[in-house]
Structures are given as C-alpha cells and as structure tokens.
Amino acid sequence: MRLRPLLVLGTAALIVLSGCAPEPDPEPTPTASATVTPTPTPTPEPAVEPEAAFDVTCDDVAAELSGLVGEPATPVDPALSLVSGPGWLPGPAQYMFQRAAGIACSTGDSSRNWEVSIVPGADSIVAGATERGGYWGEVGWCDAGTCIFEFPDGGVFLSASIRDTALGAGDTDRVAEALRRLSTTAAASIREVTYVDSDIVGMPCEYFITKEAVRDIAGEDVSLSTRFDGWGIPAEIYEVVNGSRICYFMSAEGNMETARSYLMVTSLPAGAWAFEKQVGTAVDIEGADAALASEGQHGQRYLDLRIGLDWIRLMTYDNGSGAADPTAYAPTVVRNLTKGVTAPE
C-alpha cells in the first residue's frame, strides 16, 4: 500500500525552455485545471488515459495542419515532440498536457515538423506563468520556415510550433486562422472531467531518492538541482498543474557545464496509462508493478517504473565510459514510494 508522504512542500523545479524567462523562486502548490474535479486516489486499477476537457482531438489538429503544410511527415503522435526538446522531456513530461485534461500532438523530423498543445484552465495558467515571469502575452508569427503561436482563447490555452521550409511571414494570418478554429472549438466545448489524484503530486525530490543514496551508488558527493534556466507554459503545466518534479543529481564539484551527471528523476502522476505506451525490455524490480529498460539517442539509459497508477522515469548519463545502470537506484526509489521515507531535514 502506498504511504502518503508527511511533507509535500518543496522548491519548484523549473524547466529548461528556449527563450524562457529568467528563473524565479516560486513555491507553487500543484493544482488541477479549473475544469477538473479532484477525487480520492483510487485503488490501483487498469490504467485509463485521461479524458480531454473539450471536443478537439489530434485527428482534428492533423486535419487543420495538413491544410497548411500538407500531410504529416510521420504518423501523428499524441505526445510532445522530441525533435528539438530539452533533455528532461523524453518520457513522462511528453504527456503532461493530457494529465492536465488537454491534448498534445506532434509529427515530423528535424527538417519538417509540427507540435500543437491545447489545455483548459487558461486563466489560472496565464496568471501563474505571468506571476513567475514566463508569459508576456500572445505570440503569433511565421518567418523563414517557422511559425510560433501561443495564446489563450476563452477557457483554453493553445501553443503551436510549425517548421516547414515553405512557410514565411505571409503565412501568419492563415496559420492563425487555422489554429483559432481549433482553440475556438475547444473553448466552446469545455466540460468537467474526472481528475485522478496521486500521492506523488507535489512530492519533493528527496522523497524519491536522497543525495546520500545517490552518493552511495555514484561513489562521490552529489548535488541536487531542481532548478533550470527559465519558466514558461510547459513549466507551469508540469510543475504547478501536474505537481511533477524534475530531480537532477550531479557531482558536487563543478557547474552545470562541467559537473558529471548521474541521475534525473521525472514523473507523471497517475501516468500508468502513458507508461503502457513505452517500449523497452521488461525488468524485475521488487515492489514495482512493472519496469522497462531502454536507451536514449545520446547514450542515456532509462528505467521506467510503474508504481500503482504513477509513472516514474530514472535516467542516467554517459559521462565518457557509458551510462550507469539505472536499476541500481530503483530499489531505493521503489522502497521510498511504497514504504515511506524519513522526512528530509
């Protein structure tokens, strides 16, 4: 049986976003979108994907985008794109918009791609991101093969990036019209949906694994960073709306450029449905309901854990001699989440 932690307060983990604001020092309390109704944490049951709080799907998004830039270069994925995303994104964070009762849709490769996300609760999201210096108003432009849009519309917030060599400044209006059709439809169909609570919402990194435990495995003193280089709408969704954390353990000596990277922990509360979409080699980890091992494109090693209805990813890095086996950290993480851990000082 999962134990609820004694303490659920912690410094907000800020997310690396290109062009984001300087990092503030918020201590946000994770909250659900205004359109979802919290319910008690359920007994573990078959994982079910969260319902979007509006009547727009990735099929609808693909239809609009096909009219702008042609058929998708690759099958449309109901997740955030990894084409140019930051290193923490692969895994749980790709599905953060669904956790917030929204959608995220992406397709393409490095030369031609698009990504669109829509999420309810626009007023609170804009207010929070503005307070934390990560939102300065609507964005909408096309130029030199790229279109970037970000705006609230009624009760929803839409973000989009489109890359195609044929796009130019003259396409701004028609792209805006297509995206507004999507946001208007979503805003007009907002409804309340069930929100599945989770014990790991707002949980500090030390409740997953402590610096001391990582040190004992890594063989040297480590520092814990929950801070990155900026804040934006994705940070607001991941950290505040979802209550997830980014926990990055690196050598105590050095800075962000020179330190040795050992472990990153990311999570998707009540994200077992997304865990089941992952591909990897099954691993037996005592206490976990399921575990999958896989590798990243740059030498990283992943271990995905399903614990009850939650998805936790452990990622290790190649520091020059190959990434360490993340299963070394798994017993501690699983024990802490299932049996409890002494509150960190």
What name fits each language-model region?
Residues 21, 57-59, 104-110, 141-148, ...:
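Sequence contexts marking disulfide-bonded cysteines in secreted/extracellular proteins
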Residues 15-19:
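C-terminal motif of bacterial Sec signal peptides marking the signal peptidase cleavage site
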Residues 21-97, 176-243, 323-345:
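N-terminal "mature-domain start" segment
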Residues 71-139, 224-300, 307-308:
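Short, solvent-exposed recognition patches
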Residues 28, 50, 62-70, 110-118, ...:
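Extracellular/mature segments of secreted proteins
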Residues 130-200, 280-345:
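A short, solvent-exposed beta-edge/loop patch
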Residues 1-10:
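Bacterial N-terminal signal peptides that target proteins for export
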